[in-house]
Amino acid sequence: MDIINRGIAFVALFLSVSAFAAFEDDLPYLKSKWRSDVTDKSTGLGVEELKVKAEKIAAAGKGVKPWCLVKAEIFKMICEEMSVGFSPHDAFPAFSCWSKKNRVLTKLINERIAEVDSTYCPDAKVKSKEVKGSILRHDYDHAVPDWDRILKLGFPGIKAEIDASKATNDYSKAMRIVADAMLNNVKRLVKIAEDSKEANNPVIKAEIVALKNLAKAPPKTAYEVMLFQLLFFYYGEHLDHLQVRSLGNWDRLLKPYYEADLKSGRTTREEFKNLVKHFWWQWGSLDNWWGQPVYIGGTKADGTTEYNEVSRIVLEVVDEVHVPTPKLQMKIAPNTPDDILSKALDMARRHRSIVFCGEEPMAKAMAAMGFSAEEARTLDIWGCYEFQPRAAANTTLPCIINMPRIMVDLLEKARIGELKAATFEDFEKEFHRELERRLEISLDVVRAYEANMDEFIPALVHSLSIKSCVDEGKNAIGNGMKYNLSVILQAGSGTAVDALAAVKEIVYERKEMTLAELGQVMADDWKGHDELRLRMRASRRKWGNNEPLTNKLKRDLYRVFGAAVNGKANSRGGKFFASGHSIDFFYIMGRHTKATPDGRMKGEEFSKNISPAPGADREGPTALVASINAINTRDIPGDIILDMMIHPSTIQGEKGLMAMKVLIDRYFAAGGCAMHFNVFSAEELRDAQEHPERYENLQVRMCGWNVRWNDLSKKLQDAYILRAEGVLQP
């Protein structure tokens, strides 16, 4: 009891204004923490030394022990031997394995994948090449822990539960090794902190007390919750090599701890907010390209909102620290408090990293996938804006279909005389048939890849957070969940639709050239046809303008896509679903795809997600939402995302906020699940390109994450400027 009382005293001291210098004084350390090795080298090994030891363990175990046990032993070694560090400028420890691009296990896992493929599915890679321009991959790097459960257990409870499990297979043995290693690492952190030169610093003292408490019990204070989350994240993502793709429903999770801290006098609102800033900066410093997801909001079982005072503090912190990551996702419903929605929308128009996710349309999409209303109410948002039943599902994203490449290949066949289409309807049917063929091949390849996930990615830390996996000794990222989902993504559906409309106009309506001749123009990248290219690029007959032809083409395209994918069995006891998500493949694939008849040149980016192509939506946001209303979003239940670019002059002041609310309401009513904003003028972006030193903090929404403008290549910057030039102005 005495240690708990002393811990409370120290935590109170830690949270007091006197324990920290001004937050700005801590920033230099916080910014550098996860971008260089700030650990005390006398405490252990750096990442390169750990890699050498890991490779020796792997070599010794090869052919002798199951991979899950070898991986667990490597995890244990890292926990015991990596160097760590503590700073008076930070509430959280540092570790030597800090880089996402240089994790200890990366090389070993890639080698393991190659070995598993050559053993179990040697033909899959060859077969995947038939899906030209698309990407078929081993996608395993997504996990959402059951935060509710493990916050109640703590590290000792996690260990006790796996020790008590009746499962006796190799996987459960590996989980026991990892549970022991995590708990022992917490104890090791205590000893290193106590032995450090800074041990008497108030901040380090508070950290020692919190770590001691976590070594004996579940978190009891808001600070201990944050420390637990950071440690569990680190163990899973950096040591066990599986991305933790959400910190959970953060305001709901933190609320009881924050309120207990307030009631006991351990903290004040401002002191808690200061601590949240330090927590936020852990990921601000990591600064990985796609960001660390966290979400707030939701609806309770009684229909009232989950938003609370922690939600408001989170918004204030996101606004004030202004870093691209963590990226904030917000559940939006009719019960969302107006002050919270207004604050968030105002932040979005000032370039903060927020995505708005509609509870009602997500519930409809979940229903289309066969999930219950309760599973929809409590769903986790993860990744960019994906969603799944909380603590009951895993999701892979193993395939990204390149839709414009189908157009390129059909026109090439026409050019060499292998394709004839007397009518546009014949050509569209051929496009759909080819899409179906590529999807059928893709699903077969994915089944082969995913059938052996346990052999290369035993997700040991994540599995410890899932009750059924602990009880049954199963892999949470393989087939160990209630729902094991495989979602098929697409890139460039808007570009493909615009290209179809262009083929109809050029070949079948205006009869300016034959299909074969158009194929030659595309092969030549529009050379000698600049006038036609500019006309097609400027055409209003493009997806996103509420234009009847492109609305129908998009609806038919998604119908074919969904019918070929949704509900089909995968190889993990689950199902496939189609998604409107493209991640960043809209420009990755665009770089390697030849010209398309919509005016796009070779190498230019595609449309992303369900959005229009750059510069295509010239009729304004209302027309864009009307276009979305014209499709059946249930055809792509895996995710329905819109990237909305708006001219800043159209959403100024209170009327501007109201316009944004109306836009979101209409989009959600149309079945869209997630929306994010880029609020820029072309003039501002051109000035930022010319004078980067004036815009060091300018952020743009890339896809499901924010990036700093100055970190983009000129080609990507030019694409944003092109899109901004087409935005409707007053």
Task: Identify the meaning behind each predicted range.
Residues 2-10:
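Sec-dependent signal peptide recognition
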Residues 9-18:
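Bacterial N-terminal signal peptides
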Residues 22-175, 198, 202-210, 217-730:
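Conserved catalytic cores of very large enzyme subunits
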Residues 158, 182, 186-189, 503:
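Amphipathic alpha-helices that form helix-helix packing interfaces
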Residues 173-185:
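Extended non-globular scaffold/tether segments
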Residues 183, 190, 194-197, 205-208, ...:
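Heptad-repeat amphipathic alpha-helical coiled-coil interaction surface used
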